[in-house]
Amino acid sequence: MAEFHRIIIDTDTAGDDAAALIIAAKNPNIEILGVTVLAGNVSLEQGAKNALAVLELIDDPTPVYMGASTTFSGEEKTCFSVFGADGMGEADLIHPRSKPQEKNAVDFILETVRANPGEIEIVALGPATNLALAIQRDRETMLKVKRIWAMGSAGFGPGNATPVAEFNVYKDAPAYKMMIELGVPLTILGLDMNNEFTWLYAEELQEMRSGNKIQQFMANCTRKLLEFKQRNGIPAVDFPDALAMACLAWPDFVEETTLCSASCITEPGETYGMLIFYKAGHTYDSMPTIVGKPNISVVSKVKSSEFVKRMNAVFLS
């Protein structure tokens, strides 16, 4: 029998976040208690509108809460999205009728975990600012999170924000450092799991434009991403956030994880935002004393060839 998950989704809602939301909302073994939003791919306000629009698309009443508009240190975030200015393909898709809740995202996270100790899992699809603010305010409560699932880091491969740093970590490395050092069980999916077998190609997207309302939405919200990828010689779009959600939603999807401890580079310079993983049981010539006990399961093998088929099945359900 599949494990039941009670989750909070923390997101900077763009196209691949939309796919992740849909995968979670349509899974009978997942209860989404709330969607918390922060600035990242797009501004906080735009991210909230995007989340509301996606939930309305699938008739899901999950409440949306607005969180951090700046970095953990209070600096304004320069938002950039390969999904277009609105994070959703600039296809005039985002006209939500509902509004976010008045309660702040950090308050919601802490109240929910406090009321359900050891039961709540958090799926972090964007920068970790909301989680860092929650940790700063009430670390003892955040230690009662059952598990954090995160799309972040380059895994054991190259980055996308820089050669060594992935976007979510790079946008607020001090916040990510706080998250990985909290000490609760943490599963991280990095960019190295995002390969050509997990992409949707231009021909498939064109077919989806004649499909149901979810398929049409997903094909259109990834329009700008496809243009960006094609300019770089790739005739397809990728879904790293949806891959991260798949690790939670589909129990057999993850074939291998590597237990690690980690450090996050927060000092300015070429390696800023790099997440360095130290494999448990592996002997290194020089092991930094700042690295704690292994508590991070880094996803190192998934059923890549199954991903698109399963995601499309969700869109059709």
Locate predicted features.
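Active-site histidine-anchored catalytic micro-motif
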Residues: 2-53, 92-195
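Conformational coupling and interaction surfaces
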Residues: 2-4, 22-31, 170, 174, ...
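Metal-dependent C-N hydrolase catalytic cores
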Residues: 5-7, 48-115, 293-303, 312, ...
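Short glycine- and Lys/Arg-enriched binding-loop motifs that mark or flank ligand-binding interfaces
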Residues: 10, 63, 80, 122, ...
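A residue-level signal for conserved active-site and pocket-lining positions in enzyme catalytic cores
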Residues: 64, 179, 245
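Short, well-ordered secondary-structure micro-motifs
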Residues: 75-77, 160-161, 198-201
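Short, surface-exposed amphipathic charged segments that create phosphate/polyanion-binding patches used
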Residues: 77-84, 162-166, 205
